[in-house]
A protein has these predicted regions:
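Glycine- and acidic-residue-rich phosphate-binding/metal-coordinating active-site segment common to enzymes
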Residues: 132-137
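Non-heme Fe(II)-dependent double-stranded beta-helix
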Residues: 1-14, 21-131
Length: 138
C-alpha cells in the first residue's frame, strides 16, 4: 500500500483533494476494466432484480439504449468489493482523515457517445447529515 505522508495530508486539507498515483497494480486495474467492459456489454434486460442497479438512456445519435450508470455493484462482484474495502482505499482515507469511514455509495458513470451527459448540478441531498458529516469520493 502507498502510505501517505504528513505533507500529503496537509496538501489534502489545503487543496481539498489528493491524487495518489500507482495505488493499484496493473493486474488489479486490468481486472476492474474487464469487469466494467462486461457491464457495458450487457443489455437492459440482462440485469437481475435486487442486485446491481443499471440505468440506461436513449442515445442522441440513434434510438439505441445505452448504459449511463451502474450502482450497487460492489457487493456482487469480488474485484470491486476488494477495491472498495481494501486497505489501499479505506486505510488511506482513514489515515488521511483520522477517523473510521464506510462505503456510502458505489457508482460508475459511463460517458458514451450519444449520451446526454449530466447538466450542471450539485450532489446535495437533504438529510445527508443523518448519514455522516464528511463524504469523500475515491
Amino acid at each position: 500500500m502507498n502510505k501517505i505522508s504528513e505533507s500529503d495530508i496537509a496538501e489534502f486539507h489545503e487543496k481539498g483533494f489528493l491524487l495518489v498515483k500507482n495505488c493499484f497494480s496493473e493486474l488489479e486495474i486490468n481486472q476492474a476494466i474487464k469487469k466494467t467492459q462486461e457491464f457495458e456489454a450487457r443489455l437492459p434486460n440482462d440485469w437481475g432484480r435486487g442486485n446491481e442497479m443499471a440505468y440506461y438512456e436513449t442515445s442522441q445519435n440513434n434510438s439505441e439504449r445505452i448504459l449511463m450508470r451502474i450502482e450497487n455493484y460492489v457487493d456482487y462482484h469480488q474485484i470491486f468489493h476488494d477495491f472498495a474495502y481494501s486497505e489501499k482505499i479505506l486505510g488511506t482515507i482513514e489515515h488521511l482523515m483520522g477517523e473510521h469511514f464506510v462505503l456510502f455509495k458505489d457508482k460508475i458513470n459511463f460517458k458514451k457517445s450519444g449520451g446526454g451527459g449530466y447538466r450542471p448540478h450539485q450532489d446535495k441531498t437533504t438529510k445527508w447529515s443523518q448519514y455522516g458529516t464528511i463524504f469523500l469520493n475515491a
